[in-house]
């Protein structure tokens, strides 16, 4: 039996709560996770009525496989042959990219919050961060984000603009810092993880266990991880 996600707030499934729910919904839809009999009846009724997202982290689950089947799956999944094939599989690469992007967005949110600026959402900021992650590690992108948010705060103090307008400049400053670094081939000091944003279980599974790189999804660029033997 798998206990409700909300019972273990320190053990994050993915880098953000919205993605947690997306993962759980996918596993339920694919009949990999089954609702445990210990789950309250009204929660399951809400799911049937397409009104379940707010309660999904309160559910208990059972895995729809026997222990031996799970052991065999783990053995196959962690074999060198499987990992080698996964490194070339688009779906696997997309998951790796998604984890790194979500970690970067979470840090951007946290950093803007420190400066009392609203979180910037949208395709544009995601595109900028993805461009950064093509070359740099998440720990280095943290550096771009930190200084980008700091520049946003300074811009807000200098100009008669509202906070949302100032926060929207984050993508401009992050992009500018990245382009300057690439143009002049500057060293980017990697940052440490912050206490409030620990490595997620999904990141640990993919990068530490499957790719055999301790917190590699944070410490190393993805292209480097996928090209290593």
What are these regions (language model features)?
Residues 1-229:
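Basic, alpha-helical nucleic-acid-binding regions used in initiation and control of genome expression
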């Amino acid at each position: 039996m798998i206990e409700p996600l909300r019972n273990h707030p320190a053990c994050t499934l993915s880098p953000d709560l919205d993605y947690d729910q997306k993962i759980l919904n996918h596993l339920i839809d694919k009949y990999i996770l089954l609702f445990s009999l210990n789950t309250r009846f009204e929660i399951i009724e809400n799911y049937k009525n397409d009104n379940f997202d707010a309660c999904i982290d309160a559910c208990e689950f059972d895995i729809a496989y026997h222990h031996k089947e799970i052991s065999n799956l783990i053995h196959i999944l962690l074999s060198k042959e499987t990992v080698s094939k996964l490194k070339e599989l688009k779906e696997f690469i997309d998951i790796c990219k998604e984890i790194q992007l979500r970690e970067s967005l979470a840090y951007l949110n946290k950093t803007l919050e420190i400066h009392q600026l609203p979180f910037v959402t949208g395709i544009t900021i995601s595109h900028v961060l993805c461009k950064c992650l093509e070359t740099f590690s998440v720990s280095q992108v943290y550096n771009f984000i930190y200084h980008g948010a700091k520049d946003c705060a300074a811009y807000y103090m200098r100009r008669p603009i509202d906070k949302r307008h100032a926060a929207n400049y984050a993508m401009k400053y992050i992009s500018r810092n990245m382009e300057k670094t690439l143009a002049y081939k500057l060293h980017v000091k990697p940052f440490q993880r912050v206490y409030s944003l620990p490595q997620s279980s999904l990141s640990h599974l993919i990068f530490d266990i499957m790719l055999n790189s301790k917190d590699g999804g944070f410490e190393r660029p993805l292209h480097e991880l996928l090209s290593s033997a």
